[in-house]
UniProtKB/Swiss-Prot annotation:
Gene: BUD32
Catalytic activity: L-seryl-[protein] + ATP = O-phospho-L-seryl-[protein] + ADP + H(+); L-threonyl-[protein] + ATP = O-phospho-L-threonyl-[protein] + ADP + H(+)
PROSITE patterns, per the entry: PROTEIN_KINASE_DOM, PROTEIN_KINASE_TYR
EC number: 3.6.-.-, 2.7.11.1
UniProt record, GO biological process: filamentous growth of a unicellular organism; single-species biofilm formation; tRNA processing; tRNA threonylcarbamoyladenosine metabolic process
Homology family: Belongs to the protein kinase superfamily. BUD32 family.
Domain comment as written in the entry: This protein is considered an atypical serine/threonine kinase, because it lacks the conventional structural elements necessary for the substrate recognition as well as a lysine residue that in all other serine/threonine kinases participates in the catalytic event. BUD32 has protein kinase activity in vitro, but in the context of the EKC/KEOPS complex, the catalytic subunit KAE1 switches the activity of BUD32 from kinase into ATPase.
Residue ranges the record marks as coiled coil: none
Complex formation: Component of the EKC/KEOPS complex composed of at least BUD32, CGI121, GON7, KAE1 and PCC1; the whole complex dimerizes.
Subcellular location: Cytoplasm; Nucleus; Chromosome, Telomere
Name used for this protein in its record: EKC/KEOPS complex subunit BUD32
Entry keyword annotation includes ATP-binding: yes
């Protein structure tokens, strides 16, 4: 089945090398070394896009047709969902909420060509929030001096993730599938900052959101609480020994952005009101989740 789908997407992007990196119910995600407009592998002079973090690897997301749907209905659904996802990402970019930059689109064929965020961790995995925590857990087992419960970098990254989600929700935007796999960590080298002393330079991570196939716009505290609960549960299931600490740091960051001085006094008050409503609703969502677990 996968070979058939790969052959199908190759019809829409001919002569483009593709490596499948994930397959979901709605879409396939490929990695490619080819930019749709620039030949970065050529020795010829070219203009690099200043907005892209990566000029060697790109992502192609493809929504395949569904054979059980009428062709016209299928086209409308895929086109509508692709347009919706792209609009959501453009809105994020305008708000400076970190996400991949869009390079090219083909709405009729359900294709989004975008930049590839993140990098490879020392163990060879992509630097998603989940994989990074897994890597640190493996390092902790080998080195007793490492303690994830009391690690300044882990605390900072978790708070940054919480701040990122807070900014998303303050703009009444819902991710819809907020797992730790859909948060990518991008390395930032402080040496690139001219104000940084070269002897004191270091590398830290900035989080970005990916995969907006289930995204939506909503000001409801319920929808924001469900977003947070999905991430809480994802962390609990994959990092159970550290979940309480990690989720606590995440909520600290989430609260920090609602209290942020980057907003004027009126917006601060509104942010605090929204925060109160969301946290209260989150407690209700947690309670429902526990009841479902008890009932099986």
């Amino acid at each position: 089945m996968t070979d058939h789908l790969i052959a199908k997407v190759q019809e829409h992007v001919p002569n483009i090398p593709l490596k499948i990196i994930s397959q979901g119910a709605e879409a396939l995600v490929f990695e490619t070394s080819v930019h749709p407009y620039y030949n970065y592998n050529s020795s010829e002079k070219h203009h690099e896009s200043p907005s892209l973090h990566n000029h060697t690897t790109f992502i192609i997301k493809y929504r395949p047709t569904k054979p059980y749907r009428h062709p016209k209905i299928d086209l409308q659904i895929n086109k509508s969902r692709t347009i919706g996802e792209v609009k959501f990402m453009y809105k994020l970019s305008k708000l400076n909420i970190a996400c991949p930059n869009i390079i090219s689109t083909d709405f009729n064929n359900g294709i989004i060509w975008m930049e590839c965020l993140g990098s490879k961790l020392p163990n060879g995995t992509i630097s998603s929030f989940k994989n990074w925590l897994w890597y640190l857990e493996s390092q902790e087992k080998e080195d007793p001096s490492i303690n994830l419960h009391d690690d300044d970098q882990v605390e900072l990254v978790c708070q940054k993730v919480g701040q990122l989600i807070g900014r998303l929700h303050l703009n009444d935007m819902i991710h819809g599938d907020l797992t730790s796999s859909n948060i990518i960590l991008t390395e930032v080298d402080t040496k690139k900052n001219e104000d940084t002393d070269a002897n004191n330079s270091s590398v830290y991570f900035e989080p970005a959101l990916i995969d907006f196939g289930l995204s939506s716009f909503s000001g409801l505290a319920e929808d924001k609480a469900v977003d947070l609960y999905v991430l809480e549960r994802a962390i609990l299931s994959t990092h159970s020994n550290y979940a309480d600490k990690l989720n606590g740091w995440l909520l600290e960051g989430y609260q920090q952005i609602h209290d942020s001085i980057e907003f004027n006094k009126t917006k601060q008050q509104l942010g605090k009101s929204k925060l109160k409503d969301t946290i209260k609703r989150l407690e209700d969502v947690r309670l429902r989740g526990r009841k479902r677990s008890m009932l099986g």
